[in-house]
Regions:
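Carbohydrate-active catalytic/glycan-binding domains of CAZyme proteins
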Residues: 1-164
Length: 164
């Protein structure tokens, strides 16, 4: 597993100034840092308990050659318009590499307003990602974190929210 040394000299804020991001997961694939954040759009929606104040319609993947290098927005990686079961709210994703493919695991709301977990696949860590036609059955959840264990088994940990 690749290691990156964290020092005070590496502190930087913000990573990008062109888009609003939140809730990232970060991974090192082939010696490069990839960051998978939520992408929120600016809007005038009021805050409410349904999360309607979040207009999260797509994912961008950020990348860095090192902690001291410029952070690059690699553009659109996946849009809600390309995911058949999704109505809105693409929240905090995660990504793993397995057998030469990259799997973006993400929560989103369906057309009934329920959160589910979905999966999209790419040959590249920056996408574009092709979504599976359906969400993971029984996954009424948010904030997936995916782990490939030492025995090569894959685990998905997640949180519940609003019926999850």
């Amino acid at each position: 597993m690749a290691k990156i040394k964290l020092e005070r000299a590496n502190e930087r804020t913000p990573l990008v100034k062109t888009i609003y991001t939140a809730d990232p997961s970060a991974h090192v694939f082939d010696g490069k840092i990839y960051i998978y954040p939520s992408h929120d759009f600016e809007h005038d929606c009021p805050d409410d308990d349904n999360g309607d104040q979040y207009i999260m319609q797509d994912y961008h993947v950020l990348s860095m050659d090192s902690l001291d290098s410029e952070c690059v927005d690699n553009g659109l990686a996946l849009s809600q318009d390309d995911i058949p079961w999704v109505k809105n709210q693409l929240w905090a994703p995660d990504c793993i590499c397995r057998n030469g493919k990259y799997y973006l695991v993400f929560p989103a709301k369906d057309y009934e307003g329920q959160f589910h977990i979905g999966v999209a696949v790419s040959d590249s860590p920056v996408g574009p990602f092709t979504p599976q036609e359906n969400c993971i059955e029984g996954s009424y959840s948010i904030d997936p974190a995916v782990l490939v264990d030492d025995d090569d088994r894959v685990y998905c940990y997640y949180g519940g929210l609003w019926g999850g």
